[in-house]
């Protein structure tokens, strides 16, 4: 009997999660910290970025964040420790000899997501030609004007 263990390596998962307030941030953070295999959760509200470090599966982490009601997708430029560190003019955040942010020789991969947002109408320009026409009905009926008419003997009189 051959037993093979599926060992998941320590990984860093970066996601873009749409969060509006501190309550959303705490909901996402609490949900992720309760997961088995998650060691650390860092949230950057300015960039709408959530960084999860641990042994948890990427799909399970995405699913857990989406269960909180927040929209989540993988970060476009995945974590790459080769581009971190070093001393440069930009504080060593992303180090490149040219002084630009992000990896230069690599094209940004298309974010992979287990949920097809395009299929469900998110992030699509298909609806740009749709114009919302306001409803022409109002809160007043067509007989409202006759209630205040001088010709109507049962009309209201405003003094």
Curated annotation (Swiss-Prot):
Top-rank lineage group of the source organism: Eukaryota
Coiled-coil residue windows: none
InterPro entries found in the cross-reference section: HMA_dom, HMA_dom_sf
Residues annotated to bind a metal cation: 21, 24
Prosegment location in residue numbers: 157-159
One Pfam match: HMA
GO molecular-function term, one example from the UniProt record: metal ion binding
Record PTM Cysteine methyl ester, positions in chain: 156
Classification via Gene3D superfamilies: 3.30.70.100
Domain called HMA: residue spans: 10-73
Covalent lipid adducts (S-farnesyl cysteine), residues: 156
Keyword Metal-binding: yes
Keywords, alphabetical: Lipoprotein, Metal-binding, Methylation, Prenylation
Reported function: Heavy-metal-binding protein.
Family listed: Belongs to the HIPP family.
Record protein name field: Heavy metal-associated isoprenylated plant protein 28
Annotated organism of origin: Arabidopsis thaliana (Mouse-ear cress)
Organism taxonomic ancestry: Eukaryota, Viridiplantae, Streptophyta, Embryophyta, Tracheophyta
The gene coding this protein: HIPP28
